[in-house]
Amino acid sequence: MPRLGSRTIERLAIQRMDHIGIVVEDLVAATDFFVQLGLEPQGTGMVEGGWVDRIVGLEGVRAENTMLQTPDGDARVELTKFHAPPAQGGNGHAPVNTLGLRHVTFAVDDLDAVVAGLRARGAELVGKVEQYEDIYRLCYVWGPEGIIVELAERIG
């Protein structure tokens, strides 16, 4: 069993990360943003019925999903628009230190080109482009509806 500091941790048996789910209000705008980044649409569909209600713990779910895949096929992003019950909360541009899942990171070959392309489409950086040691150039970008996307260019 692996150790973390003084703790021994018993591991379960996951195989890999399959996808990350992001709830959005404007499914088209969010899809367009991620497609512009380079993700490939895999399909859009409506989910509803008792089976989905039981999985998510809500009643009367009617939701539209778009699945997007990274070019290497190793990861996917599922964007979901809840038609019923309506989505709750959401703090548009919550700061990066807000508790909970706060960003998703994508590797890029040319950070400057990707940032320039996103800026041309109206996206804004959360902070600045910075270098981490001799390993990465990194930045955070505001996506639609306050989604934070980290871009990472490996340099070393």
Predicted features along the sequence, with ranges:
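Terminus-proximal functional modules
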Residues: 12-17, 21-23
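Eukaryotic phosphotyrosine signaling hubs
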Residues: 19, 101-103
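Histidine- and/or cysteine-centered catalytic micro-motif in compact active-site loops
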Residues: 46-47, 82-84
